[in-house]
Amino acid sequence: MPPQRFHEQFDQIQRSMPDVPLAMGPDDAAEFMYEKGVVLVRDGEEAQVVEDAVRAHFTAAPDLDQEQVRRAGPLTNRSGITRIRVADPGEGGRDGDRAVVHALRSVREHESRAGRRMAARNHVVHIAVNACPGDEPVPAPLSEPPNPAAAGTPHDPATSVGVLVVDTGLMHDYRSCGLLAHTEGDAQVRERDDRGILQQYVGHGTFIAGLVAAVAPNTDITVRGSLDDAGAVLESEFGEKLFEAVDASGWPDILSLSAGTSNGRTDGLLGVETFMRELRAQRTLLVAAAGNNGSDNPFWPAAYAALPGWEDSVLSVGALRSDGESGACFTNHGPWVKVYAPGERLTAPLTGFDSPVPYVYQHSTYDACRYGSGYGCTCQSPAHSGVLSDEGNAAKPDQVMFEGYAQWSGTSFATPVTAGLVAARMTAHKERDPRAARRQLLASEAGSAQVRGVGVPALRPPTWRPVPVVRQAPGL
């Protein structure tokens, strides 16, 4: 049986959130994860309207328990949202939540009259394998330079561009990498497990910072470890995490975000609605990953780039494969993805600069591309066995040692490459407005690539080295 990446990752994230029972959706499909027994609403009068509507609907249904319907909190917060409990979250399995589905149906008439959504699932926002990293990291040869290589622009504190990365924290040895000399921020909370093995997703934020620094050396990079818990956070907390990050560091020139979720909708993510309105009123440019589901379904908050009013403040980024000619097999796509950049087999700092660090693979590779592509993609190569894919099997999971740099793939990494290109444009043209730099960059420097047979705008850093792809023979 081939690996079941989404289900494997669901189990991993559920283990990281033991007190929050999760389900997958929509219904029994494996597209996103959400909190069981709860719906998310705007606080204030609207929350009361939803609570009353759900209670009335459940009272009329003999197999639904209206006694379970109550406010779960918080009563209010800066994001302007609250949770309403609609069922015992401990009941039922992981394949959907019938009570949540009924609760959402119960407010449809109210939503129709109001002209907007009033309730939503409380999704898990994450950097997981089916979301932003397209694979797991691979040790880079010690002789191999970063890719993209470091540009030659000097760092000037008087003109440097501020870049905020909201992700996992910085690894303990990041200062041993000269590329990260102008990076600061939160430390990774727990890098290794009890056996001394590197935990999954740690180093994600460090890798991202390294890509920004390589493409745009004249940057001051701040990394906030808002997603240190297996790279996941509930939507109800995500907006608060973003506000906390900008409160701690100030609104930056560029906010690089390599996390998100789909939600089966085209009108945004309720949990970040207030933050996104505040972002629009600032001068900050949000550069956000389009996600790695190989899908055209909107992935939030990146897909805000296609909503009226946010076209100038959000730039959504898909990933090119290693030769830069076409989209990577995993990249999300569609008109809501505004630009593509290299995102496959990039080389940047991870950990192990002071001493080697062991890592055991969690997911096994596939025999063929899980998205149907015909080249030797990271679904298949380099081949390895993983703990989560081979539970109960005799196959021993593969272990590697990291000694500084790694190769990694995903729209997670095409995003900081693009953020770096915007920052580099600001430096080269003495442009202080990041949104103006974005417009200028796309107008004057974007080339083209093919994604699912469609021509799309593509950005390729001058110091990035294409890596030829290997074509698979038919039937392999």
Q: Which residues make up each language-model segment?
A:
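Short, small-residue alpha-helix embedded
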Residues: 378, 413-429
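Autoinhibitory N-terminal propeptides
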Residues: 1-52, 56, 118-131
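Active-site core segment of subtilase-fold serine proteases
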Residues: 136-220, 237-254, 258, 353-403, ...
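C-terminal subdomain of the subtilisin-like protease fold in secreted/lumenal serine endopeptidases
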Residues: 252-259, 313-314, 387, 401-405, ...
